[in-house]
A protein has these predicted regions:
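N-terminal acidic, glycine/proline-rich low-complexity segments
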Residues: 1-305
Length: 305
């Protein structure tokens, strides 16, 4: 389903490594666990990133009664983070989709989708980076409603596993396969940050959080508390903060090595099909330098405090 007709050279330009100030929106299932909160804060404390809006994404796990409830809880969590950062929420935080994409050609309407389309189509120098760290129905729906945004955005998504992995049923992609198919097939510029063997390197511990996050203002104390409360037994325990991978990539792509390849074929069973060299290109992360990303986050928290 090619919705976007970017010339190959223009697509390559859009897939070039980010440099200088980046205009972005963040699409996040903020309440599904505790890593999105770190990504929200990291993005807002990054001077090189101009975060124009934050969208709540749907999710369904033990922390919600369904995708819509997950989206609403994520929206409320976004507000809690903004309050602790003294950042206004009006005209900045938006409710997203109440459900996942159910048909490849039928978008899910929401205020987040409307805002994304309006921002993407507004005059600007360079692309709008759409950073998605949850189920990707909001982004897919915007592309289905207004395919022209695909020529004006770059999608950076934490979702799925590498193509060499036997399946790609991780949380973000596995609950939203149809939306992921729209995104990978549409022809828009996509940067994928896989979970297995890439983002999963971003592990940290309670002692490290206590040393470098706790006491860094109201937001540092909040991040520390939700991290410490997430697991009862902290002995020999670490936790992956998956979502900061996307923000680390935008702050310094050298920290998240990547390569350009033909866009993958996502099958209905959440596995990858054989690579097709005739498909449009995308960029995929192949590694991540954990210490550089966490070091940058810790320094920004200290400076903010």
């Amino acid at each position: 389903m090619a919705l976007v007709s970017l010339p190959p050279q223009k697509l390559l330009e859009r897939l070039a490594l980010p440099s200088g100030p980046v205009s972005m929106v963040l699409d996040t299932d903020t309440y599904n666990e505790i890593d999105d909160q770190f990504a929200v804060v990291y993005s807002l404390l990054s001077d090189a990133l101009d975060v124009e809006a934050i969208y709540a994404a749907p999710f369904y796990n033990s922390r919600s009664s369904g995708p819509g409830d997950g989206m609403r809880k994520s929206y409320d969590e976004i507000l809690r983070l903004l309050e602790r950062l003294d950042h206004p929420s009006a005209g900045f935080a938006y409710h997203g989709s109440e459900r996942y994409l159910e048909h490849l050609d039928t978008p899910v309407q929401s205020e987040a989708v409307d805002d994304l389309i309006a921002r993407a189509m507004a005059p600007r120098d360079g692309p709008l980076y759409v950073v998605a760290i949850g189920a990707i129905t909001n982004v897919a729906s915007a592309l289905l409603i207004e395919p022209a945004i695909g020529e004006r955005i770059v999608i950076v998504w934490l979702g799925g596993h590498p193509q060499y992995w036997p399946h790609t049923r991780e949380f973000n992609l596995g609950q939203d396969v149809l939306a992921a198919q729209v995104v990978f097939d549409c022809g828009a510029p996509v940067v994928q940050i896989p979970c297995k063997n890439v983002a999963e390197h971003l592990r940290t511990t309670v002692p490290e959080m206590e040393r470098y996050v706790k006491g860094r203002g109201a937001i540092g104390d909040y991040l520390y508390q939700i991290f410490a409360d997430f697991h009862t037994d902290h002995f020999a325990w670490s936790k992956v903060i998956w979502d900061i991978s996307t923000i680390g990539y935008l702050n310094n792509p050298d920290w998240v090595p990547s390569e350009v390849r033909p866009s993958p074929v996502l099958l209905d069973g959440a596995t990858w099909g054989p690579e097709d060299p005739s498909r449009h290109l995308f960029r995929v992360a192949v590694d991540i330098h954990r210490d550089q990303v966490f070091g940058d986050l810790f320094r920004k928290l200290a400076q903010h405090a």
